[in-house]
Amino acid sequence: MALVETEYRGQVMVVRMNRPDRLNALGVQLRAELAQAFVEFRDNPDSEVAVFTGTGRAFCAGEDMKESLERGTPGRGAQPLENPFMDGTLDKPVIAAINGFAMGGGFMLVERTDLRVAVRGAVFEISEAKRWLLGGYGHGLIAGL
């Protein structure tokens, strides 16, 4: 089963995380499929804008800690992949459609977008801050929100 679904609606590419049973938590496979989707978006001359969302009651709950613990790398995430969305080289707009939780790494994904639209009751949280920890590199973008 694909953890990231893409569909085209004219010049709009919809990128949807599809791991609702884990609140779209960021595991190795989901990260790889997101990277692939955003490379496809970047390279498609017919795509002008992407709408980025998640299936179920969460946009993204952040790092998949269960998978991270099984890998033996708790809290460190997976190895970086070529992802024009995350590395700042994407020159097309991305709109976040936030349908619930955007926590930790999910909040970081929201930070990378150009426009954010959220349902009433959406939850934004940087969990690391509750424990006086430094979050991922993306949290430096908060000032731009």
Language-model features: locations:
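Conserved CoA-thioester-binding segment of acyl-CoA-metabolizing enzymes
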Residues: 1-55
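Hydrophobic/aromatic residues within transmembrane alpha-helices
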Residues: 15, 52, 64, 109-111
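Histidine-centered beta-alpha loop that forms part of the nucleotide-sugar donor binding/catalytic region
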Residues: 18, 63, 99, 121-122
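Glycine-rich acyl-CoA binding loop
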Residues: 23, 27, 99, 106
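An acidic, glycine-rich surface segment that forms the CoA-thioester-binding/catalytic face
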Residues: 31-35, 39-43, 65-99, 138-141, ...
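Short active-site-proximal "capping" loops at secondary-structure junctions
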Residues: 55-59, 65-67
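CoA-thioester-processing core
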Residues: 83-91, 97, 103-145
